[in-house]
Design a protein with these regions (language model features):
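Conserved alpha-helix/loop element of class I SAM-dependent methyltransferases that forms part
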Residues: 145-163
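Class I S-adenosyl-L-methionine
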Residues: 293-316
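A short SAM/SAH-binding and catalytic strip from SAM-dependent methyltransferases
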Residues: 231-246
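Class I SAM-dependent methyltransferase SAM/SAH-binding core
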Residues: 168, 174-220
Length: 316
């Protein structure tokens, strides 16, 4: 039996119960998403860590009977072992999902959207600092650090992290990237709308003389000086801006252009959580044109652990 045929076994079994679960598993066995992202997506769909663990165990048993020793069987076992190793974190994430504090519904106004983000992240960070900024971390500091390291490596490959770089992290969350980047840049500034996130970031960055963390008002980059940064990054923050209204996205991109120096880059990692890549690309190109950016990259997926999508804009 070929590897592709092996992988069809758990996908078909899941499809009998739920086509969405089948699609998640298909993407995993086809190598499109990592094991942590797969478990995150299963948790989002099922909102029950025990149910996810049971489904994964059943899948492994089926694979042992039909395709023991195959590549697909080993991949299934990897998923099972990851679930076991992070059972407490997965249960915490399932609890967070069941609490129904988050919502994918577009806000009725920018004001409502900003208030929603403040409430959501003030609450989330108190449940799990790691999961509050990356559900795919499964609440694990180690997994989150691996994902963070991947981002830092990519920023360095793009030439955006040097000893002379003044960097801005838009939606800095708990400050994980500020901590990782501080030894590699001249100065790093983080801004976030959530007071509780800012507290966590300030605590994690305590003792780092070249890091500043500030609470923003959510309406833009108010208070940051013109032409004061060489690079700005936004990791999983633009989806919430977009959910709050396109006008807010326009404001942030225009503000990024204002605070960046000439040839400085705005790196957006995930612009939205939509599956509509064409719409994302069209919007980003329009935003770039109206705010004085050139488009460097649209839609890249360079990460192994995380399924983040890259959008890079360079200030003219």
């Amino acid at each position: 039996m070929s590897g592709d045929e092996d992988a069809r076994l758990p996908v078909a079994a899941a499809g009998d119960a739920d086509p969405t679960l089948a699609e998640i598993l298909r993407r995993y066995f086809d190598g499109e998403i990592s094991a942590p992202v797969t478990l995150m997506q299963l948790l989002i769909e099922m909102e029950d860590a025990d149910a996810v663990a049971g489904a994964v165990r059943a899948m492994v048993r089926d694979m042992e009977r039909a395709a023991a020793g195959s590549v697909a069987h080993r991949r299934a076992r990897e998923l099972e072992q990851l679930m076991k190793a992070n059972s407490a974190g997965c249960e915490r994430i399932a609890m967070m999902l069941r609490a129904d504090v988050d919502s994918a519904k577009p806000a009725r106004s920018v004001e409502e959207g900003i208030a929603f983000c403040e409430r959501l992240f003030d609450w989330s960070v108190q449940q799990s600092e790691e999961a509050s900024v990356a559900l795919y971390s499964l609440g694990s500091p180690e997994l989150l650090q691996r994902a963070t390291d991947e981002i830092v490596v990519q920023l360095r490959r793009w030439g955006l992290v040097t000893a002379n770089t003044d960097l801005l992290d838009i939606g800095c969350g708990i400050g994980r990237l500020l901590v990782a980047l501080a030894p590699r840049v001249r100065h790093a500034t983080g801004i976030d709308v959530s007071a509780e996130m800012v507290k966590a970031a300030q605590r994690r960055c305590a003792g780092l003389d070249n890091v500043t963390v500030i609470k923003g008002d959510g309406y833009g980059l108010t208070g940051l000086a013109d032409a004061s940064f060489d690079a700005a990054i936004a990791v999983d923050s633009f989806p919430y801006l977009r959910q709050s209204g396109y006008a807010l996205v326009e404001r942030y991109v225009a503000d990024a252009a204002r605070v960046l120096r000439s040839r400085g880059e705005l790196v957006i990692l995930n612009y939205s959580y939509s599956e509509d890549a064409d719409t994302e690309a069209k919007e980003l190109r329009a935003l770039a044109e109206q705010s004085g950016f050139d488009v460097v990259e649209v839609g890249g997926r360079p990460f192994r652990l995380w399924d983040g999508v890259v959008f890079r804009l360079r200030r003219r």
